[in-house]
């Protein structure tokens, strides 16, 4: 199945009822989840980091892209990639991360507003949701 077909399948999943998208941490768990009948997979930043003996947020974009490519190659399911905070402070950094993920075979992805440079904080009611942040590739 081509990446374009996987992306179309992933997009179609979003048009129907909510679905569960599990997080494989390696190629073996991706195959098990595929065999269990899930319709798509999503990378897990913390799960992948832990397989490397690191904390969440301590994995480079290059490592995430290599991990994404390995998962996309081992399964016929669409793979959505966790791109952390976009791997840089600028919108161009996020655009580069998305382009690299697409080139690695990702069918979708997510970018969170997260900052690993300081201690963990709690969110309060002042956080809003911005519109128009959806992208597909």
Describe the predicted segments one by one.
Residues 21-23, 43, 79-81, 110-111:
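General beta-strand structural signal in soluble alpha/beta enzymes
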Residues 40-65, 85-91, 109-130:
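Glycine-rich, proline-tolerant flexible connector loops at the mouths of alpha/beta enzymes
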Residues 5-8, 54-81, 104, 122-137:
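Alpha-helix-loop-beta-strand connector modules within alpha/beta enzyme cores
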Residues 26, 33, 71, 82, ...:
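Conserved, mostly hydrophobic/aromatic
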Residues 16-19, 38-39, 75-79, 106-107:
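Short, well-ordered coil/turn segments that N-cap beta-strands
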Residues 1-23, 27-35:
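N-terminal amphipathic alpha-helix/helix-capping segment at the start of soluble metabolic enzymes
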Residues 22-27, 59-65, 86-103:
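Glycine-rich anion/phosphate-binding loops
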């Amino acid at each position: 199945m081509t990446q374009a077909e996987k992306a179309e399948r992933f997009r179609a999943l979003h048009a129907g009822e909510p679905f569960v998208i599990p997080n494989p941490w390696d190629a073996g768990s991706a195959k098990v989840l595929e065999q269990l009948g899930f319709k798509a997979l999503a990378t897990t930043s913390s799960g992948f980091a832990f397989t490397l003996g690191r904390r969440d947020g301590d994995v480079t974009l290059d490592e995430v892209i290599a991990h994404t490519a390995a998962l996309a190659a081992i399964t016929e399911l669409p793979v959505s990639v966790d791109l952390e905070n976009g791997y840089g402070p600028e919108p161009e950094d996020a655009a580069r991360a998305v382009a690299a993920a697409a080139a690695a075979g990702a069918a979708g992805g997510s970018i969170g507003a997260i900052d690993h440079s300081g201690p963990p904080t709690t969110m309060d009611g002042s956080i809003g949701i911005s519109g128009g942040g959806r992208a597909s590739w």
